[in-house]
Amino acid sequence: MTYLLKKNPFVANNLLKKINKLNRKAQKEIIITWSRGSTIIPIMIGHTIAIHNGKEHLPIYIMDDMVGHKLGEFAATLNFRGHEKGDNKSRR
């Protein structure tokens, strides 16, 4: 058995409390979080979580194939705009 299988997945306490509260009420509303390092666990399935990408919160709907991944994997932090077309400065 590997070391990581012995450890419990990390989920921020405030995020876990919000999800448990919504599950008890059987409500679906957007949960705002800055915790990109939290692991997606099965009780999160069906909820929409707004994950902070450094500038804004991106709403992500949690599906069953996302379980085990981190929240930050689904909110990209960089926007690649492509290389400049006429950039010949490095060709000297």
UniProtKB/Swiss-Prot annotation:
Q: What is the lineage of its organism?
A: Eukaryota, Viridiplantae, Streptophyta, Embryophyta, Tracheophyta
Q: Which UniProt keywords apply?
A: Plastid, Ribonucleoprotein, Ribosomal protein, RNA-binding, rRNA-binding
Q: What is this protein called?
A: Small ribosomal subunit protein uS19c
The GO terms this record gives for MF are:
rRNA binding; structural constituent of ribosome
GO BP term, example: ribosomal small subunit assembly
| Location of this chain's protein in the cell | Plastid
SUPFAM superfamilies to which the protein is assigned, alphabetical: Ribosomal protein S19 (SSF54570)
This chain is encoded by the gene named rps19
Among HAMAP family, the record links this protein to:
Ribosomal_uS19
